[in-house]
Amino acid sequence: MRHRNSGRSFSRTSSHRKAMFSNMCCSLIEHELIRTTLPKAKDLRRYIEPLITVSKSDSVASRRRAFDILRSKSAVGKLFTDLGPRFAKRPGGYIRIIKCGYRDGDNAPMAIVELMDRPVSSDDTEE
């Protein structure tokens, strides 16, 4: 019985789930926009929002806490040098989830996850 167990299992073991969300966090930090299924996007908030909050105060302890989740030096570097100062004045709500239809093949609901206040590149203006 799964009484009072929060979060979704996604039919994965806990280590697989931890690795999946760690990789998704790294991809979101690196690219600032990813496309995934809607349930995964909603659960990704539980991982990325506290990471960005930790990155607002740049200390050795907070960098180690972020590295414990991300396991990527480049992602931790960008998180603390770029994203932390960018979201310093924002009290929360660092990501935006936009529904974007259904996936071909299995009709899974898809979503785009992007960081708020993302700088607009020239590729985005052409669309």
From Swiss-Prot:
One GO term describing the cellular component: cytosolic large ribosomal subunit
Pfam families associated with the record: Ribosomal_L17
Family under the similarity heading: Belongs to the bacterial ribosomal protein bL17 family.
Quaternary assembly: Part of the 50S ribosomal subunit. Contacts protein L32.
Gene: rplQ
UniProt superkingdom: Bacteria
One term of GO molecular function: structural constituent of ribosome
Species classification: Bacteria, Pseudomonadati, Pseudomonadota, Gammaproteobacteria, Legionellales
Keywords: Ribonucleoprotein, Ribosomal protein
Any one GO biological process: translation
Signal sequence residues: none
Name listed for the protein in its UniProt record: Large ribosomal subunit protein bL17
